[in-house]
Amino acid sequence: MPDDLYDRDALAWSEHQASLLRRVARGERVNEVDWEHVIEEIEDVGLSELHAVQSDLHQMMVHLLKVHGWPSSPSVGRWRGEFVAFQKDAARRFAPSMRQTIDLARHYRDALEQLETADYEGTSPRARPADCPFNLDQLFGDKRAALEQHLEAAAAGIKA
């Protein structure tokens, strides 16, 4: 196989490397394995999954904050449905080793920043907590309605 196959045709490269690795697993001596790129790709698989979970978490928080901030918007039903889809996807992809890497507070701040200038139906959002009121277990395990109530309670605490 050509040396530049990795750069030209990722599918053909990955199929060829998988074939070579199967031969190595059977005990054959194979000198063609592109170890540098194989190692890089294995590392990228984990990072890709982590980034997907982080993206879903961000979207979950954005949608919870939208529902909380603009509860009378006609879009609330859609936001709730999208939240559930992001939650299911994140929970399905989440692995315990990700827990130590995910910075939930940062993702919450990013969601707040994203909504800072949002204006739905010409209204500003209701007050919301500056700090993330959720933990990962709640975000992955709790029902949407329970998370909305938790956010509501946290926001009520800042009004006093």
Language model features with spans:
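Surface/interface-facing alpha-helical segments and adjacent flexible terminal/loop regions used
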Residues: 1-160
